[in-house]
């Protein structure tokens, strides 16, 4: 067993204050802590829940040191240096021997952006087998925006209050009409797998996502970036916060390396 000085575990507040996550906290809503899970509410009806976790910084250290037939029971200062070296030199496999399982509720269009990198394992709610719910994403007034510029070189700007409210009203009306059509079709005997075709991509879905730290960092680098759509950035911010809590040394090395997965 190593005789090096054991690292003091910084508090969540300390990690957030020094990691850059603090700038993003206002993008996510309330946080619920229970003995079984950690939940962050996102958007109007969504959430990210850390359903299960088998991950810490020591798992990275031991995965790397197994090449030398070494194993440690606790972190010390040298281990932080090792993790930073692995991150900086892009030695990625030691970051794969761990697991996070998330339960997510998000609009369908967010879920499709989430699945696109195809990292991790997914199981999603199916409107083929279960009745659809009438929960839909209606953006907050400040999130209604207009696109300025050309594709590949554009920015988003807020709209005036009148257009923001008109947009919200229009979305709510479309959602109500779509769900009413869905219910009519089901009541008339149309199979759910076909009736679901009328449901818009603003409808909420749920899924489980199991992922290791290396893939998780890749997701964060893509979906928490300023170029990602605002709605999925809110979810990525929540995922990032939960990742930082469980693997603080790895997370700090990730940020120091330019937020690029090894």
Residue ranges and their predicted role:
Residues 2-262:
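Family-specific signature for flavin-dependent thymidylate synthase
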